[in-house]
Amino acid sequence: MTDSAYRVDTISRLAQWRIHNLSSSTYRKSDPFKMGLWNWHLSVEKSKMLLNVKLYPEVSNLTRENPPVASFALRVVSSTGERKALSHPEVIDKRIKTNEDFIWTIEVPLTGKIIIDVEFLDLKVLSQDSGELYSIWANGSTENQSQVTAVTSLGRMLTESIYTDITINASDGSIGAHRAVLAARSPVFRSMFLHDLKEKELSEINVLDMPLDACQAFLSYIYGNIQNEDFLIHRLALLQAAEKYDIADLKEACHLSLLDDIDTKNVLERLQNAYLYQLPELKASCMRYLVKFGKIFEIRDEFNIFMQCADRDLISEIFHEVLSTWKGF
C-alpha cells in the first residue's frame, strides 16, 4: 500500500482522507496532519456492519497540557456503487485529548472507496490566566499579530529615526522622536504641542534632568520596545519621568518592579522615592523591611544620615511604624 493511502490532504480548515479500498475487516490510521496548533490523526475500524471513525490529536506535551476544544463537521462519502454521503451532526466545543474522546459509529455498510471530510469550524484552548476558552482562529489571533507587527514598526520608527519631527535633548545628548507618538502616550506632551509653547515652536523638548541612556529607555518604553535589562537599570529615572509626564502605566510598572528586590543597599532610596511619588505599597514594604525584619540595625549609620535629611512627615511615619511594631518587645 502506498504512502498516499495514509495521507490526509488539507486546505484552509478542511481535512480530507481518501481511502481507496476499505475491505470488510480492516483498521487504518492516517498519517498526522496539521490543523491549528496540533497534529491530528483520523482512524477507521471496520467490523462486519459497523464502521468506527475516530478523530484525535497526536500525543504531545501540548496535547497533554492544553488539549484542543474542537468544533467540526464530519462527513463520510462512499463512491462505490450507489453514492452514499453520511454526515455527523456538528460537534461543538468538544474537548479531544485521546483517541477515545471522539468516535463516530456508522451502522451502514460501506465498502470500497470512501472519503472522510473533516471541516474544522473552530479550535479553542483554555487560557492559563483567565481559565476561559478562546479561539485560536478568532479575530483576536489576527488582532494579536497586528499588534505585534505595529509595535515592532513603532520601535523601528524610534531606533531608525524614521521621519522624526521633534528632538529630545537630554543632559548629555539628543534623540529624535515623533510628536504624534509622544502626544498619544502623555497628556503633558500633548498639551505642549497643542499650545504655543517653546517646545512646539522650536520642535525641541529639553529633559536635562535625564542622561541620554535613561532618556533612550524612557522613549523605548513609550514606543513599546524597551528591553528588560534597560528597564531595570533605569527604573528610578523612569519613575521620575512617568510622574513628570503623567504616564500612569509606566509609573505602575516601576512601582511593581521596585517591590521585587528591596535590600539593605537600596531600601532607604526606595523609601524616599516611595514617599516622593506617593507609592504606598512600596513605602509600606520598605518600612516593614527596616522595622519588622530588623534591617534598620544593619544600616544604622546610613539610617541616621537618612533621618537627618528626610521629610518630617516621613520621619513621623517611620517612628510610628517603630512604635507600633516594637510595642511590647
UniProtKB/Swiss-Prot annotation:
Top-rank taxon: Eukaryota
Segments passing through the bilayer: none
BP GO annotations: protein ubiquitination; response to salt stress
Domain named BTB: residues: 164-231
Pathway: Protein modification; protein ubiquitination
Gene3D superfamilies, alphabetized: Potassium Channel Kv1.1, Chain A
GO cellular component, one term: nucleus
Matching SUPFAM superfamilies: POZ domain (SSF54695)
Assigned keywords, A-Z: Ubl conjugation pathway
InterPro entries tied to this protein: AtSIBP1-like (IPR044714), BTB/POZ_dom (IPR000210), SKP1/BTB/POZ_sf (IPR011333)
UniProt keyword Transferase present: no
Coiled coil: none
Function of the protein: May act as a substrate-specific adapter of an E3 ubiquitin-protein ligase complex (CUL3-RBX1-BTB) which mediates the ubiquitination and subsequent proteasomal degradation of target proteins.
Domain notes: The BTB/POZ domain mediates the interaction with some component of ubiquitin ligase complexes.
Name of this protein: BTB/POZ domain-containing protein At1g55760
Species the sequence originates in: Arabidopsis thaliana (Mouse-ear cress)
